[in-house]
């Protein structure tokens, strides 16, 4: 069953679509996001369960409806040269349907500030050029030693195949049993949303042929960019498992035409309670091992006055079961 909501202004007709994963209209908008999305967070506009918005062919977004808020993952995805026009259309549309916008992580403040919005630095994106990625040099010594140790222990990396599905699911379920609050969502991927057509999954196999960990990478920029999404391993996996998975992927991406890689944005730390919801300090330290270039991301709210309410809406999008459930993940 497909639900559409249209709004009409002097700029044209804007269409909302909320549908099942097999709906043709939704697939068309998801394809637009995959082709034109330039931000590492842009693939999450097409997450299952989000309302997708067609901005007269100029742009596409997805949003989570949280009370009166439209919580958007990232920048408006547009064809070149149409960002400000598409943004104006989106803001007009959301006013007409009675929703306030909050953009969770955008790459540039200027278009939103020109539209009268308030911006606040919320995260940093660790970017890597795969063409220049190497394990050589002092800065990469920790990863280099981990990869050597992993290979000595018999670990190897293989791409996803249907035959590995059950084992990968088993690894994920074991990992989730260590997280009492379960999976989060929104711009944090869920394995039950895994689509091999749009997600690159790689698994680590030990010397006995057992899968002990895996990563997933989302595609954007028309297939020329990747963003690290899910990282999971078994409790008894060798310590260097994840280092091997990431380093092996980074070493092979350039040969397959990938020009840009994100290790996944890391929120700015907000103190001890925030760390219990999402452990940003340790995650930032881990990703720094791969020598990325950190680029700032900004949260956009309608105004400074509405910023606290916008943050609460974003928190609800990530933790639909409530912040307390997320806190229980990391006691």
Predicted feature locations:
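Hydrophobic, well-ordered secondary-structure elements that form the walls
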Residues: 287
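A conserved beta-strand-loop-helix scaffold within acyl/acetyltransferase catalytic domains
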Residues: 14-71, 75, 103-120, 125-270, ...
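A structural motif corresponding to the C-terminal end of an alpha-helix
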Residues: 290-291
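Short acidic, S/G/P-rich loop/turn micro-motifs used as interaction or catalytic elements
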Residues: 76-80
């Amino acid at each position: 069953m497909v639900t559409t909501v249209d709004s009409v202004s002097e700029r044209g007709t804007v269409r909302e679509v909320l549908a099942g994963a097999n709906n043709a209209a939704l697939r068309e908008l998801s394809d637009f996001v995959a082709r034109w999305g330039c931000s590492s967070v842009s693939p999450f506009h097409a997450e299952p369960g989000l309302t997708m918005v067609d901005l007269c062919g100029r742009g596409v977004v997805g949003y989570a409806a949280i009370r009166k808020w439209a919580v958007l993952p990232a920048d408006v995805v547009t064809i070149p040269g149409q960002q400000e026009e598409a943004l104006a259309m989106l803001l007009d549309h959301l006013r007409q349907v009675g929703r306030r916008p909050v953009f969770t992580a955008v790459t540039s403040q200027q278009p939103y500030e020109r539209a009268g919005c308030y911006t606040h630095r919320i995260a940093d994106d660790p970017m890597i050029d795969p063409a220049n990625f190497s394990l050589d040099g002092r800065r990469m010594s920790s990863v280099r030693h981990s990869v050597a140790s992993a290979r000595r222990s018999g670990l190897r990396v293989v791409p996803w195949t249907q035959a590995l599905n059950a084992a990968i699911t088993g690894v994920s379920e074991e990992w989730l049993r260590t997280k009492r609050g379960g999976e989060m969502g929104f711009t944090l991927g869920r394995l039950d949303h895994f689509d091999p057509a749009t997600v690159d999954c790689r698994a680590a196999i030990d010397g006995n042929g057992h899968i002990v960990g895996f990563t997933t990478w989302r595609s954007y920029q028309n297939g020329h960019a990747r963003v690290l999404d899910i990282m999971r391993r078994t409790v008894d996996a060798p310590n260097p498992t994840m280092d091997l998975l990431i380093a092996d992927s980074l070493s092979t991406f350039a040969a397959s035409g990938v020009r840009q890689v994100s290790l996944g944005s890391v929120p700015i730390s907000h103190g001890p309670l925030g760390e219990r919801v999402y452990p940003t300090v340790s995650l930032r330290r881990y990703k720094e091992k791969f020598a990325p270039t950190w680029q700032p991301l900004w949260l956009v709210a309608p105004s400074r006055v509405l910023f606290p309410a916008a943050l609460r809406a974003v928190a609800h999008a990530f933790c639909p079961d409530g912040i307390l459930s997320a806190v229980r993940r990391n006691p």
